[in-house]
Amino acid sequence: MRVALSSEGVFPLAHGEATAVGASVSGTLQGEGILVGMPSLFVRLAGCNLRCEFRGVDGSVAYCDTPHAQRTSGGSVQEVAEVMQVVVEHLGALRHVVITGGEPMLQAEAVAELCQALKAGRDGLHITLETNGTIFGEEVAEAVDLVSVSPKRQKETFVEGRPSHDYVLSLQQWLDAKRGGRDALQLKFVVGRREDEVRLIDPLLSALEGWERFPVVIMPMGGDSTTMRASEPVAVEMAIRRGWRYTPRLQVDLWGGRKGT
């Protein structure tokens, strides 16, 4: 089976020179969520079913921080076995792999096969799937250790101010599939202004059952330090007031959000 990768593909890889994070070995740090700071290797797939935009406290608009992964053009198509081999060969001491995009679940069958191959190729490997939650896949849910769901309020997911039936159904399927473990799923919300709480977070949580057993993570909007700094106070205040976890974006703090980090 073949899988479409973004231009980053498996990253960051060391080929005799420093990687984008300035290291001489392959890997980076997970920048977000409950595993923030965890040494990891990333696999970025190509293609996304959303075109996200976010608004900040000053009315500024931020867009997807990985636009190069929105479409399949500009990347490569490889056999799952080839991707697995590259990952395993560059893991070194790493025990965490992150499957991200784009939206990986557009290639659910290939993702399931890749995760199964990775687990067979390296004992004790932990796999995180990063997804917007619009597409559920039972095989993928069974194959990964952590589902990192980042819900989005876009025209494809919300209708007349409420989350669509299909979106709620898909998110609920993810929650139900991972209900056996608290750290098997996280709900990671990008926050740019206070209105995001009543426009995105509360409507979604009120439509879902059993979300309380999983971590809710609040993350400031911004693929660059200037935008992120402006939204941090809102995210911090919301996390404290609601008793949720706050996450930084280490890839922005440490490396300016540049590609390959």
Residue ranges and their predicted role:
Residues 1-26, 242-261:
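Short, basic/aromatic-enriched C-terminal tail that caps enzymatic domains
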Residues 3, 8-10, 15-16, 22-25, ...:
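Conserved Radical SAM active-site core
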Residues 27-32:
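Short secondary-structure capping/turn segments at boundaries of alpha-helices and beta-strands
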Residues 34-36:
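A short catalytic or substrate-binding loop motif that flags glycine-/basic-rich loops and adjacent residues
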Residues 84, 105-261:
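Conserved AdoMet/S-adenosylmethionine-binding subsite of the radical SAM
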